[in-house]
Structure formats: structure tokens, C-alpha cells
């Protein structure tokens, strides 16, 4: 990713996080953290990865609510970030934190069953 793309992605991440915290009042949007943003080379498309705390149903509901708010969020981005074109945004669920927790739990389970043989 080019330096400009990285800067734009960071700016989008910062602004969307701020909007989620201060401006969106949808009760379906729970504990959301924007983990990363990927921007296309031409800066016209942005995939926004969000980590959602809660059950799988809560996660799905939150992502759906974010998708419904895409128009508002994109409009606000256009006002806050000076670009020739405001990127089309897509929200995606980032499951890497959940996977990492699962891997750590499995490693702990193996360590307990193995009786600490490699210590």
C-alpha cells in the first residue's frame, strides 16, 4: 500500500471510530472497534473491518446496522476528509480477535493436558 493510501486509511479509521463513538445513536450498534481499513489504489473503495463484542447474533445485527448507516457515514467522511472522491465504504466483520482468543484457549488446554512436559 502506498504512503498516501495508508494515510487515507488511517484518517478513515480515525473518523469512523469517532462517528461510532459520538454520532451514531442506533441501539443495534453495540461495542464496536474499527480494527483496520483497506483502501483501493485509486482511493475510491474502502473496506472497513470492525470487531464486535458479543454473541454471533449481536455481531451480525451490528454489522447490518453499520451497513444501513453507510450512506450517513460516507457523507460525514466527505465533509471531514478532503479528497477528490469520497470512497465507497463496505463494513466487514473482523473475526481475527475471536480466532486469536480461540487459539490461545486451545493452547492453554493442550498445555494443561500435557502436564507441562516441555517446561
Swiss-Prot record:
Give GO terms for biological process: maturation of SSU-rRNA
Q: Where is the signal peptide?
A: none
* PROSITE patterns in the cross-refs: RBFA
Pfam name, any one: RBFA
Assigned GO CC terms: cytosol
Instruction: Give me the disulphide-bonded residues.
Output: none
- Recorded GO MF terms: ribosomal small subunit binding
Q: Which PANTHER family match?
A: RIBOSOME-BINDING FACTOR A, CHLOROPLASTIC-RELATED (PTHR33515:SF1)
Which family, according to UniProt? Belongs to the RbfA family.
Q: What does this protein do?
A: One of several proteins that assist in the late maturation steps of the functional core of the 30S ribosomal subunit. Associates with free 30S ribosomal subunits (but not with 30S subunits that are part of 70S ribosomes or polysomes). Required for efficient processing of 16S rRNA. May interact with the 5'-terminal helix region of 16S rRNA.
How does the annotation summarize its subunit structure?
Monomer. Binds 30S ribosomal subunits, but not 50S ribosomal subunits or 70S ribosomes.
The protein depicted here goes by the name Ribosome-binding factor A
Which source organism? Pelotomaculum thermopropionicum (strain DSM 13744 / JCM 10971 / SI)
* UniProt gene name: rbfA
